[in-house]
A protein has these predicted regions:
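NAD(P)-dependent short-chain dehydrogenase/reductase
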Residues: 1-50, 56, 93
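Short aromatic/basic micro-patch
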Residues: 11, 53, 83, 118-120
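Glycine-rich Rossmann NAD(P)(H)-binding loop
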Residues: 17-21, 43-50, 76-84, 106-115
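Short, amphipathic alpha-helical "lid/cap" segments that border enzyme active or binding sites
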Residues: 28, 56-64, 133
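Mid/C-terminal beta-alpha module of Rossmann-like enzyme folds, strongest
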Residues: 31, 62, 69-110, 121
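Generic structural signal for alpha-helix termini and adjacent loop/cap motifs
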Residues: 34-38, 66-70, 128
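Conserved C-terminal active-site "lid" loop/helix of NAD(P)H-dependent oxidoreductases
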Residues: 56, 87-88, 105-132
């Protein structure tokens, strides 16, 4: 459709977006609510699955850089490129927010259909970053 035309089609793909934790349905929101309700434990999985966590601010910065250029097109991952276990990220969240709540590991079984690791390749974004510098 775009062949021979002056068009740049970009499909930006974000991964596990962190931030704005009071206004979404993430596990982080649920932990905040449980802590606010005075709960001392939070039912959890094994936490072993790994995800590409990115702050909403970093994601916004990456999207802006993608949109300001037209040399790299197609599907562009806006991500960190680093898989981090859910347990590690949630424990960090609890610590960073000084929450008095402990994870109840194994209360929920890991879902067999979840991928053990999901993260993005930064190859295309790094090309954009190299051009920007």
């Amino acid at each position: 459709i775009t062949a021979g035309k002056d068009v740049c089609v970009q499909w930006v793909r974000g991964y596990y977006i962190l931030g704005d934790d009071l206004h979404n349905q993430s596990i982080f929101t649920k932990i905040l609510k449980a802590a606010q309700e005075g709960k001392e434990t939070f039912p959890f999985t094994s936490g072993k699955n790994k995800y590409d966590f990115i702050s909403v601010q970093e994601l916004a910065d990456q999207i802006a850089l993608v949109a300001m250029q037209n040399k790299v097109d197609g599907i562009i991952n806006c991500c960190t490129g680093r898989p981090v276990s859910l347990a590690e990220q949630v424990e960090k969240f609890i610590s960073d927010n000084n929450l008095n709540i402990k994870l109840e590991y194994g209360a929920f079984k890991d879902r067999p259909y979840d991928s053990p690791m999901v993260w993005g390749s930064r190859d295309k974004f790094n090309r954009i970053l190299d051009e920007y510098k």
